[in-house]
Amino acid sequence: MTLGQQAESLAQSYLEQQGLSFVERNVRYPFGEIDLVMRHKKYWVFVEVKYRSANQFGGAIQALSKAQIGRIRMAASHYLQSHKLDVPCRFDVVAIEDTQIQWLVDAF
């Protein structure tokens, strides 16, 4: 298991402990990827997981670029359309630095 896969597993477990339900992991399209798809109450939650072993280059949260946000939004839109879902959604970020987990709800 790669570090990225370990981080995604840790993020999934953490979010499940917070009351979210797991739907799918690593949804890939030619134009973008969604790390985790979760459900929280009425929301479909698209989660980006960022991992850094230390606070290098600004930390995990700063590693999310505007271009990457655009690709995630496009992938989420395609996911909703392809699954024929007309539901509210949000975009969360789980930032993992060493052993610290930070969950940003409705991050972008």
From Swiss-Prot:
Protein name, entry field: UPF0102 protein SO_0299
Organism: Shewanella oneidensis (strain ATCC 700550 / JCM 31522 / CIP 106686 / LMG 19005 / NCIMB 14063 / MR-1)
GO molecular function, one term: nucleic acid binding
Family matches, as InterPro entries: Restrct_endonuc-II-like, tRNA_endonuc-like_dom_sf, UPF0102_YraN-like
NCBIfam families for the chain: PRK12497.1-3, YraN family protein
Similarity remark: Belongs to the UPF0102 family.
Gene3D superfamilies hit by this protein: 3.40.1350.10
